Amino acid sequence: DMKDLERCLQEAQAQRFRIVVTDGVFSMDGNVAPMDRICDLAEKYDALVMVDESHSAGVVGATGHGVSELYKTHGRVDIYTGTLGKAFGGALGGFTTGRKEIIDLLRQRSRPYLFSNSLAPGIIGASLEVFKMLKESNALHDKLVENVNYFRDKMTAAGFDIKPTQSAICAVMLYDAKLSQIYAARMQEEGIYVTGFYYPVVPKDQARIR
């Protein structure tokens, strides 16, 4: 809601700092944040921009560099956060990157960074290797996009309602909460892991499996 974002930024003009924080891809519907418009407003009202690329890094964009690649906003985003537990396959852990001045500050002042145990070396090593692989070749990303499109096309042809999205998230809309739980339980019996989501996680009458 860009109008509401602009209203919030206008109301925050008296504050010393302003920061716009958004998901790159919203996990329930798979819809993508309009980063170009968000950055335009942030620059207009002198605000920082922070984007969580957990559901978009490794997936969205021509080479999987996330929504900032999709909307060509590299250099306009100040802070990126992400996870090693999704497209990068490290099972757990996450990262924050961005402008050097901000990262230097976080190393000194971020309590989660200062007072948390570090990740296991094996996870770090595997994750670094994944980043290296993605730099060297687009093959894994391209295959993922191919698989997502195949799944979406076949499910739609079979009569299922799939929310349109530029991401890899394919929410299969069932609308009825009880039905979503029946579907999820039955699929898990077949060894297919899905979760049924219903109100209040999603709006009423918008139950789905994902």
Language-model features, listed with the residues they occupy:
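Active-site phosphate-binding strand-loop segment of PLP-dependent enzymes
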Residues: 1-51
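Short, small-residue-enriched loops and turns at beta-alpha junctions
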Residues: 2-4, 24-29, 56-59, 113-114, ...
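Active-site PLP attachment segment
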Residues: 63, 69-105
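PLP-dependent aminotransferase class I/II
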Residues: 88-155, 160-163
